Amino acid sequence: MSDSYKGHLVIVVALEHYNPLVILRTFGQEGIYPVYVGINYKAPVASASKYISACHHVDSIEQSYEVVMREYGHIGEQDPTKKPFLIFGDDDVYSYYELDHYDEMMSRFITFNAGEKGRVTHFMEKEAIQKCAARHGIPTLKSVVVPTGQIPEGIVYPVVTKSISPVTGGYKSDFFICENEEELKNNMALIKTEKVMIQPYVDKKTEMTIEAFTYNHGKGMFAGVECRYLYTIKGYYSPLFDSYLPKDKELLTKLNSMMEEIGFEGIWDAEFLVDKSDNIWFLEINFRHTPWANPATRGGNPLVTLWCEAMLTGKCREPQDFEPFATMVETVDYAKRVEEMKLCSFPQWLGEFKQCKCTMYYDEDDLEPWNVTVANWDILK
């Protein structure tokens, strides 16, 4: 057991959630037990993992930074060849570090970056990243960005509203499906962000994500898994999805060119909508590790450890192919399919859960987070 990857301490900073749990387990399965700085959230699922060398509980993003610098900032400052890895799982956490403490962070740690202060946060904005995708030939939905409260002329209903960035306004609570202008006006009064993106509503067949990382200022790329939802929920993600190795080389090349333009070094997730005619439409990039990387680990492509290797050596192996399998977010899938949508009975769901190759909370080799999940089931679903 070690707390380091090839002599570099590993630090994970994230809200208490199943996302950092995935990161910790990925490292742990390779004998690396990271430091975890957990920002209190719904339930302490990640900090219950056995794959932690030291755990710090904090109540805010600002406190997380204070702990990281006080306890570990001196390591890279004293010996730049031993800079710790600093890995993030939340947009707002990373954005705070990048906007408020970029120089200190980059001088002391190996971490996600695009070469200059605020550049990653800029491309978190949906308008900026969609324009970038369009420049590289990836289809995007026609969108308009307006000050919240302003109703644009000439749009065709139904439409959806979205916060312009994951670090402003209400983010997911700013999402509404509006069938007409009256509904749009009413929902505008509830939106918290100062600017809102309005897009045509597409009756989707599914959604898909590609989980990947880039290095060498975005020039090198590794795509570890593609996920497609097995059932759709209007205005919500599906917590049950197929997982397999990405096959669309042309799309991967275009994503790589986007990342090279941005200069991003880090783990990321690209999201797409798939319409009834199987056309794909680019939605956004999450410039962070997401739990959808869990099936990449299961398939033999652990993004976090391979990214660390690429950042040290400037190169990376080819992705390992694997047989497709289903991945489940247990609490949310139960709530949606059994309780709300009545798509299956509890015995049927339980059977599928037991057969599922990849789950977010349950891991027979690391059971305490599952015990915490069961004890806080209603909070986490």
Question: Residue spans of the language-model regions?
Answer:
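Short glycine-enriched loops at secondary-structure junctions
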Residues: V37-A43, D92-Y94, N216-M221, E226-Y229, ...
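Peripheral (often C-terminal) accessory segments that flank ATP-dependent C-N-forming ligase machineries
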Residues: C308-K381
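ATP-binding N-terminal substructure of ATP-dependent carboxylate-amine bond-forming enzymes
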Residues: M1-N113
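A short glycine-rich, hydrophobically flanked beta-strand micro-motif that places a catalytic Asp/Glu
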Residues: E265-S277
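ATP-dependent carboxylate/phosphate-activation module, predominantly the ATP-grasp catalytic core
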Residues: E179-E182, P200-G263, N286-M311
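Active-site nucleotide/adenylate-binding loops and adjacent lid/helix of ATP-dependent enzymes
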Residues: V120-M197, D203, N216-G218, K249-T253
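Protein kinase-like catalytic core scaffold
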Residues: V159, M221, N279-E284
